[in-house]
Amino acid sequence: MKSILLIGLGRFGRHIAQELNELGHQVMAIDSNEDRVNAVLSYVTNAQIGDSTSEYFLRSLGVGNFDVCIVTIGGNFQSSLETTSLLKELGAKLVVSRAERDVQAKFLLRNGADEVVYPEKQLAKWAAI
């Protein structure tokens, strides 16, 4: 069982939270939107409303204590990039971030992401098989 910090609870983040729960992991879920946080309460260990671009907020979570930090923020690349960078600066062990394009992946990898996932690209490859 791993402890996971999941940041961003849109469709992709919500599905990740469900899968991680089914696999028996402990998940702390974060989003700035109260409705999104409330939507995942039944299948995460803990959830908080907060600004992931705030160093103070992330520091209060103790990001270095999680096995994995997953950033699934979509639609606001600047927030995703800032969050990724802050996580690494604050001692995150493993940071996995979401990208929609190759150029985003390059920026994320240069700024703290250990791994990058492309949900739309990976789904397109799967559908084309």
Protein language model features and the residues they cover:
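Cytosolic regulatory regions of ion transport systems
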Residues: M1-I129
